[in-house]
Amino acid sequence: MSSPSKRREMDLMKLMMSDYKVDMINDGMHEFFVHFHGPKDSIYQGGVWKVRVELTEAYPYKSPSIGFTNKIYHPNVDEMSGSVCLDVINQTWSPMFDLVNIFEVFLPQLLLYPNPSDPLNGEAASLMMRDKNAYENKVKEYCERYAKPEDISPEEEEEESDEELSDAEGYDSGDEAIMGHADP
């Protein structure tokens, strides 16, 4: 396992063979989406988020960049950008960690044990410290509004349908141009 590119391929394959749905962006192995489910027995249970992952050329020596694409209410996640404030990923990353660790350990731990003293979402941190019940209700409301399976899948299906339609239309008009119109 000498080169970062081999390690990147191995880690990505391991992630794809796990229980996570992975959607590649473009043709490279540097950017992809992972469908992440909220941890069981938590206020995030039932939520499904599409997490964008970007691997640098230096991966696994440098941490991947991760961010939620659909909204999540959490003190350590920026509500607008989806950026994650996660010490393990941002500061203490080590090549011994892999992509599966992010989705099986780091993100579930972040959701289960938020750190309101180091917030990216000050409103969520403040509400969590002031009124835990109101905070939990708001998390559940966000899960209902923004983190259902249909919130992360339909646009992909629509894009595929549109592409299939344009491919079919292009094929038909191309045939007519080459062969001409049939004689009546």
Swiss-Prot record:
The keyword Transferase applies. Residues 1-148 form the UBC core domain. Transmembrane segments: none annotated. Coiled coil: none annotated. The active site is at 85 (glycyl thioester intermediate). GO terms for cellular component: nucleus. Residues 146-184 are annotated as: Disordered. Its EC number is 2.3.2.23. Pathway: Protein modification; protein ubiquitination. Belongs to the ubiquitin-conjugating enzyme family. This is Ubiquitin-conjugating enzyme E2-23 kDa. It comes from Triticum aestivum.
